[in-house]
Amino acid sequence: VVRLVGSEMCIRDRYIGQIPKWDLSKVRPAGAPLKTFGGRASGPEPLESLFEFCVTTFKNAQGRKLSSLECHDVVCKIAEIVVVGGVRRSALISLSNLSDDRMRHAKAGQWWEQNGQRALANNSACYSEKPDIGIFMDEWKSLYDSKSGERGIFNRESANKMASKNGRRVVDGYEFGTNPCSEIILRDREFCNLSEAVIRVTDTEESLMKKVELLSLIHISEPTRRTTI
């Protein structure tokens, strides 16, 4: 059983070299049926892999703070194991400073061979003001050289302006971000709730249109949703 401790204490212990022990013997075994959601359990192995990854990451950073890329990798590794019934249940986007060279090259070259967890996140540079043309072109060149199409570009100043047009404003210094697909302007800790209209073999054109109509009504009342058909 995993014993929960204060996050600050847990992080402090990792920095001073104290390695925790964990017992996953009561985690549902791989292949066990999931009655509520359906599908099969992943078993304790993914969680074991996550814990070992975190321990290794903190060991490598002993005596210093984690870098932005190390933090990114830990979050991506967590997302990698969030699987229910064989279905991935996570999506990420990392918005990094324009000057962050580590994140700029996170998906450069054959990154997937040693850091497959990075596939779980989209990466974008966050522009808070109009950059110098030289800096802007350097960023575009690094995007091209990476051969992955990343980092992308997220214009935070524009997001703040667009949000203000709808009566939303920056509160307590927390500026606006976006969802993993960069479709929706969100506040800190807000979320995008993906909903789907499932097409079944028994559906007719009329029943499918009814599904889409109901989804649209829901989304009018809750604008931070995204529809997939």
Regions found by a protein language model. Give the residues of each.
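Active-site cavity-forming subdomains of large catalytic enzyme subunits
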Residues: E8, R12-I199, T204
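Long, charged, mostly alpha-helical binding arms that flank functional sites
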Residues: C192, E196-S221, R225-R226
